[in-house]
Design a protein with these regions (language model features):
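N-terminal basic, Ser/Thr-rich segments that initiate or prime the first beta/alpha elements at protein or domain
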Residues: 1-459
Length: 459
């Protein structure tokens, strides 16, 4: 057995993150008294409390250790107050990820997440290790033998186009916000409002500008997220071996993903309006409770050979539409309600506060896009059995997920309301290892019967 090793000091951040709210209690008392002496007392109490928490974090860090023996058995030990030990074998892992954000890279640390077979996400093991220890642990638990590497080039261009479009839209919102912030001449409606009180005049002047600046903030945050995704597509490599799939890449933040081929629960090809325009389709792979944030790879039209090489057992759902007779309108509710509210506010603002109308049109348009996604789900969502495998389409937001279930352990659950039973429809839920659920809504009974029969034959 190898000697026991300690975690990286960044592991103490997990404890501090959960207890940092305790430091706000003295400040809350100072806020109630609202005096300088109370504030100084609260700051001294916060400093003492923070020192105590740092000391407790150091004790926890010293009391925790891990060891990996020659047989590939990982032992995690905690010896604070009570001794605990958890044992993990490499064969019992469905997937693992190695993440190195910029802060971790500067401090020589890595975050390793281990996903045991069949366990839910809350049972995943997160370790903060030194860079060399993390790489050694991954190579010992899930060794890579004779990998075949590919560098698909579809992800960078798709991320760049989205980032450019977001930049242009954010600039347009910024121009609108600056224009709304300028003093504008009072119309007859605004003049009538100005005679009420100062608060109404303030709202009539600054409410349009405030709403516009909120949209600018939302666009900026979304752009930062797209920029992060673009940085992660740099130096992107996907590989496969006889028993594993994986990917690695990133520029400022590095990541690596490894999954056992036999433990892949399903593969998911996501169709979105942007993907259809660029003809580049992201493919996500889920193994147990491991749901990576980034796709395994992005392929474009004409690269189906790469798809078949990486996922030879994948089958696309058939290009047919399910029966739409008496189908539920549940697909339109998540986006239809915000769209109706935004549209109502637009109509009201035209007579009450015209300066706010243009700003309100933007969330209305966004809600309309999501409503179009709901229409796509209403038209296309369904489940089919192809070559003994469950294939399904399900809609979520603006994405249409084309899924092929690859794991043999599948449970089905049906749900029927009285209205659905009258029209021979039901909602079918697929349960996969790791407490993963896939729901297909309002499908005809005749489409679900072959799937139920296939599960009964397996049992």
């Amino acid at each position: 057995m190898t000697q026991k090793r300690h975690y990286h000091p960044l592991a103490a951040l997990r404890f501090l993150r959960k207890t940092v709210l305790l430091c706000l209690l003295p400040l809350a008392n100072a806020l109630l008294e609202f005096s300088l002496s109370a504030l100084l007392t609260a700051l001294r109490q916060d400093a003492a409390l923070l020192l105590f928490l740092c000391g407790a974090s150091w004790v926890l860090l010293e009391a925790s250790s891990w060891a990996l023996d020659d047989a590939g058995v990982l032992r995690l030990r905690w010896a604070f107050a009570a001794k605990q030990e958890r044992i993990l074998r490499g064969e019992a892992l469905a997937a693992l990820t190695i993440e190195r954000p910029l802060l971790f890279r500067l401090m020589g640390a890595s975050r390793v997440v281990l996903y045991p077979v069949g366990q839910p996400a809350k049972r995943a093991v997160t370790l903060y290790l030194y860079k060399e220890d993390a790489q050694e642990l991954a190579d010992r638990l899930m060794p890579i033998c004779d990998p075949v590497c590919h560098r698909p080039a579809g992800g960078e261009r798709a991320a760049m186009v989205l980032l450019g479009a977001n930049g242009l839209s954010t600039l347009a919102l910024l121009y609108l916000a600056i224009r709304q912030s300028r003093p504008f001449p009072l119309t007859a409606e605004a003049l009538a409002l100005s005679r009420l009180n100062v608060l109404v005049r303030f709202a009539a002047h600054w409410l349009p500008a405030g709403a516009a600046w909120m949209l600018v903030l939302a666009g900026t945050l979304f752009g930062a997220s797209l920029g992060r995704s673009f940085a992660q597509t740099i130096h992107y490599t996907v590989w496969h071996t006889a028993d594993q799939l994986g990917s690695r890449g990133g520029w400022l933040s590095r990541f690596e993903f490894r999954v056992r081929s036999r433990e892949v629960s399903y593969a998911d090809v996501r169709f979105s309006p942007t993907a259809r325009l660029m003809k580049r389709w992201p493919v996500f792979v889920v193994a147990g409770s491991c749901r990576p944030e980034l796709p395994l790879f992005v392929y474009r039209s004409g690269q189906e050979a790469l798809f078949r090489e990486l996922l030879p057992e994948f089958r696309m759902p058939p290009d047919i539409r399910p029966s739409l007779a008496h189908r539920s309108a549940v697909f339109f509710a998540p986006a239809g309600i915000p769209f109706g509210l935004c549209l109502l506010l637009v109509l009201v603002s035209r007579t009450v506060l015209p300066a706010l109308t243009v700003t309100l049109l933007i969330p209305t348009a966004v809600s309309a896009i999501f409503l179009a996604g709901g229409l796509m789900g209403w038209l296309r969502e369904g489940i089919w059995l192809r070559e003994g495998r469950f294939t399904l389409r399900r809609q979520k937001g603006v994405y249409l997920h084309c899924i092929c279930v690859l794991h043999p352990d599948v449970c089905l659950r049906t749900l029927q309301s009285p209205w659905a039973a009258r029209y021979q429809r039901l909602t079918l839920t697929l349960a996969l290892p790791g407490q993963v659920r896939l729901k297909v809504r309002s499908i005809p009974m005749q489409d679900a019967e072959p799937c139920l029969a296939a599960v009964e034959q397996k049992t």
